[in-house]
Curated annotation (Swiss-Prot):
GO biological process: arginyl-tRNA aminoacylation
Quaternary organization: Monomer.
Molecular function terms, GO-annotated: arginine-tRNA ligase activity; ATP binding
Domain of life: Bacteria
Motif, 'HIGH' region: chain positions: 126-136
Gene3D superfamilies the record matches: Arginyl tRNA synthetase N-terminal domain (3.30.1360.70), HUPs (3.40.50.620), Isoleucyl-tRNA Synthetase, Domain 1 (1.10.730.10)
GO cellular component: cytoplasm
Protein name in UniProt: Arginine--tRNA ligase
Compartment list: Cytoplasm
Keywords assigned by UniProt, alphabetized: Aminoacyl-tRNA synthetase, ATP-binding, Cytoplasm, Ligase, Nucleotide-binding, Protein biosynthesis
Family: Belongs to the class-I aminoacyl-tRNA synthetase family.
Source species: Shewanella frigidimarina (strain NCIMB 400)
Length: 581
């Protein structure tokens, strides 16, 4: 409906141009919003006030002129002027009912698909050689939910897991392995737990020994230069680490696969060319032996230019170098129209600099959109970054294990007579869903407090509440197995039917808002509101005990569309639904 009203207003602006009311080259930014008070209609626009200056007319006069010029539409019951010049649209109940009826049989619940784009989404991207920790959670699940929604809207989405499989951490591992082999000539078979402790030991040596640190950096350069021995060990380290990552992805219900891994090492052969191309354009400068780029727009508090370091004095490359190579690949090879980077907000300056440099150096096509969709931190209940009691980093698998245990206790307390296998499966879904939803339901740009007690609550905007809401709606059809809805029609008579129908019709708008800015919390908020709206409808409007057969069938169709929308919305968040809880 919102897009339909926007289209009517766009046609009105074109008519104004032809009449000379606004200049022929005028570009209007049409904004249509949902009203908070239904007495003011369903949708409203401030277009008249926006046009006042250019049309040289007062807002209320312009508002009336807009109404008089609007093309006729069966979707609009009436249009009114409010206040200084707001235009309020009242949607026709029959038109809304028809839209909902069509949504029931549509492949995409009636959602209008946008122009198809090729969109690269860079997310998760953990540094390898160590286990995933809670700091990897946000990028992984926020990115995955946006990917799912983009694909649902028909876009060609290319997942890119830009893992940190190159760099100093591998130099440390190689240097320690070199020392151990020199000492005893043996190579222990590495399991993941060994790799984790191996990394910690290497880090201690790196921090304590200047000689070891120097050797580690030399081995990084050797690795980047294609040394066969270094590459063999590097592949072993990576294989162990990636196996762990994909075990975590599977447990989280994340759609990333091995085929999506395109880490820093994938661009190793291009790094020297990046340096050459920047040099050929006269963009490189030298600073303390390193090759850097200064851009006028980026300065520190003292007004001194901030460098983008492209190549270190020892010949090694940095994140900026591989990021530039990746951007060029994504633009020129993958032909991306848009690239979204789900990376911590603390990297904002880095991305501002490399995005600017990629455009300046013409590494990406001018029309390609580069977007840093950053996020805040997950904090403990003390408001500080989430840590173990001893102050260490919390492994992601440990967090998920605890979620399983707590969810099992919760589910068992509510279903004491349920068999253990069913309890365990329900608890698995509730536990993982609660961790994911608690994160996704927060604005990604904000920090948030991680609390098991809050996320496992059956009250408020939580996964258990929504999972239960879905089972409640789906449960209606377990009691209505003999009802034929093939000829049923949706009729909106009761106020609560209209409210539920209006909310159901907003699904497409919500997905557009979510994918435009990479904001899963918008979808979470909508699903919570939809579940709450259905609860109000269900209390006020008997479904199976409706007064007439036609009314019962209409309300069953509304329940059916609600169930489909909840299930689809939760699946786009990467959350499984349950048929019983």
């Amino acid at each position: 409906m919102k897009s339909h009203i926007e289209s009517l207003l766009e046609q009105t602006i074109e008519s104004f141009k032809q009449q000379g009311i606004v200049p022929a080259d005028f570009q209007a930014r049409i904004q249509v919003d949902r009203t908070k008070d239904k007495s003011h209609g369903d949708l409203a626009t401030n277009l008249a006030m926006m046009l006042t200056k250019v049309a040289k007319k007062n807002p209320r006069e312009l508002a009336q002129l807009i109404i008089d010029t609007l093309p006729a539409s069966s979707y609009v019951a009436k249009v009114e002027i409010a206040g200084p010049g707001f235009i309020n649209f009242f949607i026709d109940d029959n038109a809304l009912a028809n839209q909902l009826q069509q949504a029931l049989t549509s492949d995409h619940l009636g959602v209008a698909l946008p122009t198809k784009q090729t969109i690269v989404v860079d997310y998760s991207s953990p540094n390898l050689a160590k286990e995933m920790h809670v700091g990897h959670l946000r990028s992984t699940i926020i990115g995955d939910s946006v990917v799912r929604a983009l694909e649902y809207l028909g876009h060609n989405v290319i997942r890119q897991n830009h893992v940190g499989d190159w760099g100093t951490q591998f130099g440390m591992l190689l240097a320690l392995m070199e020392e151990l082999r020199a000492a005893n000539g043996e190579q222990a078979k590495m399991e993941l737990s060994d790799l984790e402790s191996f990394y910690r030991a290497a880090k201690v040596r790196f921090d304590e020994s200047t000689e070891f640190a120097t050797r580690a950096r030399q081995l990084v350069v050797a690795l980047q230069s294609g040394d066969e021995y270094c590459n063999k060990l590097w592949r072993e380290f990576n294989d162990i680490s990636l196996s762990h990552c994909h075990d975590v992805y599977k447990r989280l219900g994340v759609s990333l696969t091995r085929a999506d891994v395109h880490g820093e090492s994938a661009y190793n052969a291009d790094l020297a060319q990046v340096v050459k191309d920047l040099d050929a354009q006269g963009l490189l400068s030298e600073s303390n032996g390193a090759k850097v780029v200064f851009q006028e727009a980026f300065r520190n508090k003292e007004g001194e230019p901030l460098p983008v370091i492209i190549q270190k004095a020892d010949g090694g490359y940095l994140y900026a170098t591989s990021d530039l190579a990746a951007m060029r690949y994504r633009s020129n090879v993958l032909k991306a129209d848009r690239a979204m980077y789900f990376v911590d907000l603390r990297q904002a300056l880095h991305f501002q600099q490399v995005f600017s440099l990629a455009k300046l150096a013409k590494f990406v096509r001018p029309e390609m959109s580069l977007e840093h969709t950053g996020f805040g931190t997950m904090n403990g209940e003390d408001g500080r970054p989430f840590k173990t009691r001893s102050g260490g980093v919390v492994k992601l698998v440990d967090l998920l294990d605890e979620a399983d245990v707590r969810a099992l206790e919760l589910v068992r307390s509510k279903n004491p007579d349920m068999d253990e296998a069913t309890l365990t499966e329900i608890a698995r879904v509730v536990g993982i869903s609660s961790v994911k939803y608690a994160d996704l339901s927060k604005n990604r740009t904000s920090d948030y407090i991680f609390s098991f007690e809050q996320m496992l609550s059956f009250e408020g905007n939580t996964a258990p509440y929504l999972l239960y809401a879905y089972t409640r709606v789906a449960g209606i059809f377990k009691r209505a197995t003999d009802i034929d809805l093939s000829q049923a029609k949706i009729v909106l008579e009761h106020e609560k039917e209209k409210d539920l129908g209006t909310k159901l019709a907003q699904f497409g708008e919500v997905l557009t808002r979510m994918t435009d800015k990479g904001l899963p919390h918008v979808l979470c908020g909508y699903l919570y509101e939809l579940a709450s709206e259905f609860s109000s409808f269900y209390e006020a409007c008997p479904v199976l005990a409706a007064e007439t057969e036609a009314q019962k069938q209409s309300r069953l169709l509304l329940a059916q569309l609600t169930a489909k929308t909840l299930k689809t919305g939760l699946s786009l968040l990467g959350i499984e639904t349950l048929e019983r809880m």
